[in-house]
Every structure is written in structure tokens, then in C-alpha cells.
A protein has these predicted regions:
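Compositionally biased linear targeting/interaction segments
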Residues: 1-321
Length: 321
């Protein structure tokens, strides 16, 4: 029994080292990419599984398997961009429209009634984020601390930036059915992020809320389009995928590349909502030895040293499973 226990402990230690090595390999790849490219697309090495597998082959391990996946965190809707920080008292109107279109795309009208309708949800999220407003409720459907303190168990509104995406489940109107994916429809959790904060003047901060159109999934692209154009989202995704196979003839550094699609001449995406680059990425590193497994999920941000001008990755979050 002691021998088995020792072997299991050794495997867990090895797996932890393997998974950590995968994250650091991904960070090095992202830093290299930033030094070589001024935009980010699914054609780049960090997004191509075969390229990542080649790099993993260079990490020597006596046993076990290691896999790494990198995704663009700013391909998602930035929840904290819904209001204008640092005072957080005013809506970002373009983000309000983004939320409304997204909710109406992922859920049917029957699921978006009463407290679950887009206006009610957006108002409640704003009240969760805002501060210094003397508990003023947004519209007829928002919710401040007094609402949450009457629940069982009671809790207070954050009145500040959301720090963990699961906080959305605490907000009036956001049910598990809306938050999580289900067999019939995607949920908020797959397409939103708390990351994306940018420095403002002095010590202030804000969330620009720009979404990388080169990496965004279909439901997010649908939210970028007007309600009358949402059925075109799949055409954008398919064109982008086909363009990846002929990337030398397509310019992903131009956020209006979607205009190249036949029939898209009159389609307009709000330029304040899109970008073609990102510096925030999610890395998932999975290691296994026989039936024993370990995973690390890290969110990192690319930063440049002001003196050396060298790019590195700063860890924003690190979760071990």
C-alpha cells in the first residue's frame, strides 16, 4: 500500500510539472507571436493544434501525455464593459445593444420573459457593477443590494467590477438555464469574460469592450451584427475558415475584412465594438499518466517591458484541477 501511495504521489507531482510546462510553453509562443505580428487570427501558430503539438514534442517526458489549447479571451463579450469605469454610473450604450442582441440570439422569446428579458438582465447587471449611486435602481427592473439582502441566504451587490464570471449567477434574472450551455442552446458562460481591463488616465481603468472579430465564435459575431443581419453570422464564420486556408490572399489586419464576403457590401458592424488583436489568452494544459490526470487553466496577458521592449506574459489567473 505504501509503495502504491508513493507511486501515486510521484505521478501527481510529475503531472503538475508537465501541465505547468505546457502553460509556460504556450506563454513563450504567445510572446513570440506578439513580437512578430500586430494582429491575432486563427491562422497563427498559437491557434493551430498541429503547431502546438510540434512544440510539445520538444518537451522531454519519460511517460505520460500532454495537450495544450490556447484561446483568445478577447474573442468574448467583456461583462465589465457594460458600464463606463471608473465611476461605473453610466451605460456604454453600444455594449447594451451588444448584450441585447446576444441574449436574443441565444434564447427564444419564451425564455426571455419577465425578469429574464434582455432589458431586465442588462439593468440588473449594471446595478451589480455600479457604485456611488446611493443604491439607485436602474429602470423598473434593476436590483441593488436591498433586493439581494432580502433573499435566503442574503448577500450584497458587488457594486464594482465582476471578478469571477460565475458571479453572474448571483444577479437577478440570470438563471443557470441562461448561464450554462444546454443541448439546445449556448449559454452566457461560454461567450463572456471578466478580463480585458485597460489602464486609463492616471490610476483610472476601463474595459474597452472591443471583440477580436478574427477569433470570435458565431454567437458573438451574431451579437455584433444588427438583429436583421444575425443570420449572416455563420457566413462570416465560414468565410473566415475558408480564408485561413488561403491566408496569403486575405488581410486579417483590417477589421472590415468581412466586407469581402459576397453580399456584405451594406453590412455594417459598429467599429467601436471590434478589433483584430488581443493580449489576453486562456491556456488549458492537460497532462495524464495512465488514468491519473491533472489540468491547469491559466489566463495570461502579454505585456511589454518599457526598457527592453521585450514581450512576456503575465499570469492573471491560475487554476489547477
Amino acid at each position: 500500500l505504501a509503495v502504491i501511495s508513493t507511486a501515486a504521489a510521484r505521478d501527481r507531482l510529475t503531472l503538475s510539472y508537465m501541465a505547468s510546462s505546457g502553460v509556460h510553453m504556450a506563454m513563450a509562443l504567445l510572446a513570440k507571436d506578439k513580437a512578430e505580428s500586430n494582429f491575432d487570427s486563427l491562422a497563427e501558430d498559437w491557434a493551430v493544434p498541429e503547431k502546438i503539438e510540434e512544440l510539445l514534442q520538444e518537451i522531454p517526458f519519460d511517460a505520460g501525455k500532454l495537450s495544450v489549447a490556447i484561446t483568445d479571451e478577447l474573442s468574448k463579450i467583456q461583462v465589465n464593459a457594460l458600464v463606463k469605469f471608473p465611476d461605473s454610473r453610466q451605460f456604454n450604450e453600444s455594449q447594451v445593444m451588444l448584450w441585447d442582441r446576444f441574449l436574443r440570439f441565444i434564447r427564444n422569446e419564451e425564455e426571455l420573459e419577465d425578469e429574464n428579458n434582455p432589458v431586465a438582465i442588462v439593468n440588473s447587471v449594471k446595478d451589480w457593477l455600479d457604485s456611488g449611486d446611493d443604491e439607485a435602481t436602474t429602470g423598473l427592473s434593476g436590483a441593488e443590494s436591498s433586493y439581494y439582502e432580502d433573499l435566503d441566504p442574503p448577500y450584497a451587490s458587488r457594486n464594482g467590477p465582476i471578478q469571477d464570471l460565475d458571479e453572474l449567477l448571483l444577479i437577478k434574472g440570470i438563471t443557470p438555464q441562461i448561464y450554462y450551455d444546454n443541448p439546445d442552446a449556448p449559454g452566457l458562460a461560454s461567450f463572456m469574460t471578466v478580463h480585458g481591463m485597460a489602464a486609463g488616465a492616471g490610476t483610472s481603468f476601463n474595459w474597452p469592450g472591443r471583440i477580436n472579430i478574427n477569433t470570435a465564435d458565431g454567437p458573438v459575431i451574431a451579437a455584433l451584427l444588427g438583429l436583421e443581419d444575425q443570420d449572416l453570422a455563420q457566413a462570416i464564420v465560414e468565410f473566415r475558415q475558408e480564408a485561413l486556408e488561403d491566408k496569403d490572399n486575405h488581410d486579417f489586419s483590417n477589421p472590415r475584412w468581412y466586407k469581402e464576403i459576397p453580399g456584405f457590401g451594406d453590412v455594417v458592424i459598429n467599429p467601436s465594438l471590434v478589433s483584430v488583436g488581443s493580449d489576453v489568452f486562456r491556456i488549458q494544459s492537460d497532462a495524464s499518466i495512465d488514468t491519473t490526470k491533472a489540468s491547469i487553466i491559466a489566463v495570461v496577458q502579454r505585456v511589454q517591458d518599457p526598457e527592453s521592449r521585450k514581450w512576456t506574459c503575465k499570469v492573471l489567473s491560475w487554476k489547477t484541477e
